[in-house]
From Swiss-Prot:
Signal peptide annotation: none
Cited Pfam families: DHDPS
SMART domains: DHDPS (SM01130)
Superkingdom: Bacteria
Binding site for pyruvate: T42, I198
Gene designation per UniProt: dapA
EC number from the UniProt entry: 4.3.3.7
Any single GO BP term: lysine biosynthetic process via diaminopimelate
Major enzyme class: lyase
Listed NCBIfam families: dapA (TIGR00674)
Designated name of the protein: 4-hydroxy-tetrahydrodipicolinate synthase
Keyword Cytoplasm: yes
Metabolic or biological pathway, per its Swiss-Prot or TrEMBL entry: Amino-acid biosynthesis; L-lysine biosynthesis via DAP pathway; (S)-tetrahydrodipicolinate from L-aspartate: step 3/4
Catalytic activity line of the entry: L-aspartate 4-semialdehyde + pyruvate = (2S,4S)-4-hydroxy-2,3,4,5-tetrahydrodipicolinate + H2O + H(+)
Length: 289
């Protein structure tokens, strides 16, 4: 699972899930052999009911994509998280992505017990998620060290913005797979021990993302990738990537659920230029398949 796409959840104008657009996104990833992460922050999981989340997992599994399907587990209630994992076990998913519980800001001991409680309920591979900007606390090195030998602990996704922290995760648990969780930092994190990328940008450009993950040090590619990644990061995710997908007609609508709004898109006037540059990627820099 070298490249996983952190999938959006597309919505119709009435805020219901747009399964037709969702299917297009999933098949575009299948075509390139990319795995998918459903119901992370990019998928607006906290804005969905349990029933809606299950419907997305069930739909994705029904397509028999034959690519890795990883499901996000978020929230603050341990019982709710355990119940959600139990629901997911009824489907042929391939793993879980689990952040530190949001809002509560646990210390090392509490965070470790939280993850251990969830790891003990599954034999699926689990990726621990460092996302301090949303969780309020980092994924502590001590937590990773304590859980690294657990049979269900598979990897770490690092979206903390620190290349040094990526190196520390790789050192403290060398047998775990470290994923870069920030598109713009992929080359640097790869050189510091990251073995894969969980990408937002690949929602719209799955083939180009696959090429870049496989060849992260080509300077011309890096400059373009950085420019696009930084534009996406100007706005809270997934606002910008939904704007791109709708502009390209990969999804029918750029609708988000509150408190997110497409009206908050930053530097919106650059959108046509962003899309045009990526359309030229394969012409300028051949994609390796």
């Amino acid at each position: 699972m070298k490249l996983l796409t952190a999938c959006i959840t597309p919505f119709l104008p009435n805020y219901e899930i747009d399964f037709l657009s969702f299917e297009r996104i999933l098949y575009s990833q299948k075509k390139e052999g990319n795995g998918v992460v459903l119901l992370g922050s990019t998928g607006e999981s906290l804005a969905l009911t349990v029933k809606e989340k299950e419907s997305l997992v069930a739909f994705a599994c029904s397509l028999k994509l034959q690519i890795p399907i990883v499901v996000g587990v978020s929230g603050t209630s341990l019982n709710d998280a355990l119940e959600w994992m139990k629901i997911c076990h009824a489907y042929p998913i391939d793993g879980f992505l689990i952040p530190s519980p949001i809002y509560t800001k646990p210390g090392v001991y509490g965070q470790t017990l939280w993850f251990e409680s969830l790891l003990n309920t599954t034999d699926k591979p689990v990726i621990l998620y460092n996302i301090p900007s949303r969780a309020g606390t980092p994924l502590y090195l001590e937590t990773v060290g304590a859980l690294a030998s657990h049979p269900s602990c598979y990897g770490v996704k690092d979206s903390g913005g620190s290349i040094e922290r990526c190196r520390e995760y790789a050192q403290i648990a060398p047998h775990l797979v470290v994923y870069c969780g920030d598109d713009s930092l992929w080359p640097q994190m790869h050189s510091y021990g990251a073995q894969g990328l969980i990408s937002v940008l690949s929602n719209s450009w799955p083939r180009e993302a696959r090429s870049y993950v496989d060849n992260p040090y080509q300077e011309s590619n890096t400059l373009l990738w950085q420019e696009l990644s930084l534009w996406l990061s100007l706005t809270t995710n997934p606002i910008a990537i939904k704007a791109v997908l709708a502009y390209k007609q990969d999804i029918a609508h750029s609708v988000l659920r509150l408190p997110l709004s497409i009206a908050d898109l930053q530097n919106a006037e650059a959108l046509p230029n962003v899309v045009e540059k990526m359309l030229k990627w394969s012409q300028i820099y051949p994609v390796h398949t």
